[in-house]
C-alpha cells in the first residue's frame, strides 16, 4: 500500500444525514463527532502519521447562532471526553484556525490538550476549527511583515503558517457528494490527490477509508513533472 504521510478529510454531510434520518442538525453533528472516535484507531493502524480534520470553517460562523454554539460546545466536549484516551494512545493534538475568536475558556482547554500531548508521537491529529486557508495565508503574511521582512519566500510563508511542521497533504478526502475543497489547506494541498465520496460523513466506515487509499495507490503523482 502506498505510504500516506498526511491525510486530510473534509467531513461533510452531517446535516443532510440528519435530515435523511429525521434528526436534528445537532444530532447529525454529534454523529459526525462519534465517527471520529470510531475511525481514529484505524488511522493509527494504517500508520498514517498526520491527520487533519476540517471541523468548523471560517465561513461556518455565518450559520445560525444555535448551530454555531453547538459546534463550539461539541469541540469542548470532544476534548473533555476523549483527551485521556487520545493521550494514552499516543495521539499528539494540534488545533489550527483563528482561535482568538473562541471564548477564553475553550482556548485554555485547547492549549491544555496541546500541552498534555506535545511529546506523543504515534499520530498527530490536527483539528481545523474556525479555519480558512485564505485567512491562514493572510495571517502568515501579516506575521512576516510584522517581523520586518521585505522579500518573502515560500519557506517564509511555510514557517509562518498555523502549523509550520504540517507536511504537504498526500490525500484529501471529502464526504457528502460535494466536489470542492472549500477553502481548506490550499497551501498544503497544492499537490494533493483528491477523493470525493457520495457517502455522508456519519455513514463513513473503515472500508471507505481503505477504498480511498486504494484509489490513491493507483494514481501516479508527477508533481508537475513527466
Curated annotation (Swiss-Prot):
Q: Which GO terms describe its molecular function?
A: ditrans,polycis-polyprenyl diphosphate synthase [(2E,6E)-farnesyl diphosphate specific] activity; magnesium ion binding
Please state the Enzyme Commission number of this protein.
2.5.1.-
Task: Kindly state which keywords UniProt assigns to this record, in alphabetical order.
Answer: Magnesium, Metal-binding, Transferase
What Pfam families does the annotation carry?
Answer: Prenyltransf
Q: InterPro entries from the entry?
A: UPP_synth-like (IPR001441), UPP_synth-like_CS (IPR018520), UPP_synth-like_sf (IPR036424)
Which residues does the record give as substrate binding sites?
13-17, 25, 29, 57-59, 61, 63, 174, 180-182
Keyword Acyltransferase in the entry? The reply is no
Q: Tell me, what does this protein do in biology? A: Catalyzes the condensation of isopentenyl diphosphate (IPP) with allylic pyrophosphates generating different type of terpenoids.
Assembly and oligomerization = Homodimer.
Q: Which NCBIfam families match?
A: uppS
Q: Family, per the entry?
A: Belongs to the UPP synthase family.
Q: What is this protein called?
A: Isoprenyl transferase
Amino acid at each position: 500500500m502506498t505510504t500516506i504521510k498526511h491525510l486530510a478529510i473534509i467531513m461533510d454531510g452531517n446535516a443532510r444525514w440528519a435530515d435523511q434520518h429525521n434528526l436534528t442538525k445537532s444530532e447529525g453533528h454529534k454523529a459526525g463527532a462519534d465517527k471520529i472516535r470510531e475511525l481514529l484507531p484505524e488511522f493509527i493502524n494504517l500508520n498514517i502519521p498526520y491527520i487533519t480534520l476540517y471541523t468548523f470553517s471560517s465561513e461556518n460562523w455565518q450559520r445560525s447562532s444555535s448551530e454555531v454554539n453547538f459546534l463550539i460546545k461539541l469541540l469542548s466536549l470532544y476534548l473533555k471526553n476523549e483527551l485521556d484516551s487520545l493521550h494514552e494512545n499516543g495521539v499528539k493534538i494540534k488545533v489550527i484556525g483563528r482561535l482568538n475568536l473562541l471564548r477564553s475558556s475553550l482556548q485554555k482547554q485547547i492549549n491544555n490538550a496541546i500541552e498534555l500531548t506535545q511529546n506523543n508521537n504515534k499520530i498527530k491529529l490536527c483539528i481545523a476549527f474556525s479555519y480558512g486557508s485564505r485567512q491562514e495565508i493572510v495571517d502568515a503574511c501579516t506575521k512576516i511583515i510584522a517581523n520586518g521582512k521585505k522579500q518573502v519566500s515560500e519557506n517564509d510563508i511555510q514557517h509562518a503558517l498555523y502549523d509550520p511542521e504540517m507536511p504537504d497533504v498526500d490525500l484529501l478526502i471529502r464526504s457528502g457528494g460535494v466536489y470542492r475543497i472549500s477553502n481548506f489547506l490550499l497551501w498544503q494541498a497544492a499537490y494533493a490527490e483528491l477523493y470525493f465520496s457520495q457517502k455522508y460523513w456519519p455513514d463513513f466506515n473503515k472500508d471507505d477509508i481503505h477504498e480511498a487509499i486504494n484509489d490513491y495507490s493507483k494514481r501516479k503523482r508527477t508533481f508537475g513533472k513527466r
